[in-house]
Amino acid sequence: MTEKLQNALNEQITAELWSANLYLSMSFYLEREGFSGMARWMQKQSAEETGHAYAIAGYMIKREATPKVDKVDVVPQGWGNPVEVFEHALEHEKHVSKLIDELVQVASEEKDNATQDFLWQFVREQVEDEANVLNIVSHLRKAGDCAILFMAVSYTHLTLP
């Protein structure tokens, strides 16, 4: 694995950890505001992002590369109403999709087919993640306060890893 690709993968590890912290911040905010179901959904997203960082690091180790965690920047803390929280989550998922696409491009430029293959799981997952958050945002916008109250309790059953 080239140094350029190792650096790009390490940047993605840091981005995944930042994403995990972002979702955790959203979770704490929603919990404090009394939306425990939504908070639980955000907790699950946080755990998923941490899992991505571990997956990338594990892949790098298998390829005899060195995973590194760089400084993880501070995430926002205040979010507004639940619709705004999920709108921000949607924009963030779109940003992550762009980062993954750029990472696939680096792997292609470096002629690393194994890494391209590894990364396609994240490309597919991002399509699903964006669609899921878009669906939530759409429902929240259409139903207004009723949907917010429904979601506040409907996601409390989620199991965390």
Regions found by a protein language model. Give the residues of each.
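Basic/polar N-terminal segments that are highly enriched at the extreme N-terminus
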Residues: 1-3
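Acidic/histidine-rich alpha-helical segments that form the ligand environment
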Residues: 8-15, 19, 23-26, 30, ...
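Conserved small/polar residues in nucleotide/adenosyl-binding loops
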Residues: 156-161
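Residue-level recognition of alpha-helical structural elements
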Residues: 5, 35-38, 82, 111-115, ...
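C-terminal end-helix/capping segment
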Residues: 139-155
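Conserved alpha-helical segments that form or flank metal/cofactor-binding pockets of metalloenzymes
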Residues: 30-71, 133-137
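Charged, low-complexity surface patches
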Residues: 5, 19, 38, 49, ...
